[in-house]
């Protein structure tokens, strides 16, 4: 029988990226945090679902905080120090995610809300009757 092939770990090089952009997409069901460099290449990302939350717990502020901490930790390992934050969506995890990034040690230089607003575009879904 042939000798087992040794698998080597990931060959991702550690980049030194001092500043970048954090995109926080916060919906009612989940929060996704993506950290990229200034040219748009994603350095790290995390979400409430990837942090181990399932179902309705993904939409909570605590889940957003956990996701932001995980993404920030990986960005700090790449040498990131200053960030601009772009927030999108109406979810409950917006503020907690920003606060978690600040506590993790990233210096926030700008916070911008980029939630898309329709100029009376598509018809909205019908109202829920519970």
Curated annotation (Swiss-Prot):
- A Pfam family: Ribosomal_S11
Entry keyword set? Ribonucleoprotein, Ribosomal protein, RNA-binding, rRNA-binding
Q: Gene symbol?
A: rpsK
Q: How does it assemble?
A: Part of the 30S ribosomal subunit. Interacts with proteins S7 and S18. Binds to IF-3.
Care to name a GO molecular-function term for this sequence? rRNA binding
GO annotation terms (biological process):
translation
Q: What does this protein do?
A: Located on the platform of the 30S subunit, it bridges several disparate RNA helices of the 16S rRNA. Forms part of the Shine-Dalgarno cleft in the 70S ribosome.
The family assignment reads: Belongs to the universal ribosomal protein uS11 family.
Q: Which InterPro entries match?
A: Ribosomal_uS11, Ribosomal_uS11_bac-type, Ribosomal_uS11_CS, Ribosomal_uS11_sf
Q: From the Swiss-Prot or TrEMBL record, give the protein name.
A: Small ribosomal subunit protein uS11
Q: Which organism is it from?
A: Prochlorococcus marinus (strain MIT 9515)
A Gene Ontology cellular-component term: ribosome
Write down the PROSITE patterns for this protein, in alphabetical order.
RIBOSOMAL_S11
């Amino acid at each position: 029988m042939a000798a087992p092939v040794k698998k080597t770990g990931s060959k991702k090089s550690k980049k030194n990226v001092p500043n970048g952009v954090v995109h926080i997409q916060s919906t009612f069901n989940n929060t996704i945090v993506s950290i990229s460099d200034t040219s748009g290449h994603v350095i790290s990302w995390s979400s409430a679902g990837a942090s181990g939350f399932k179902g309705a717990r993904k939409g909570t502020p605590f889940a957003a905080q956990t996701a932001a901490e995980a993404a920030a930790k990986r960005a700090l390992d790449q040498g990131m120090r200053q960030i601009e934050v772009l927030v999108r969506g109406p979810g409950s995890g917006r503020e907690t995610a920003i606060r978690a990034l600040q506590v993790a040690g990233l210096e926030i230089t700008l916070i911008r809300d980029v939630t898309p607003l329709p100029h009376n575009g598509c018809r909205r879904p019908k109202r829920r009757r519970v």
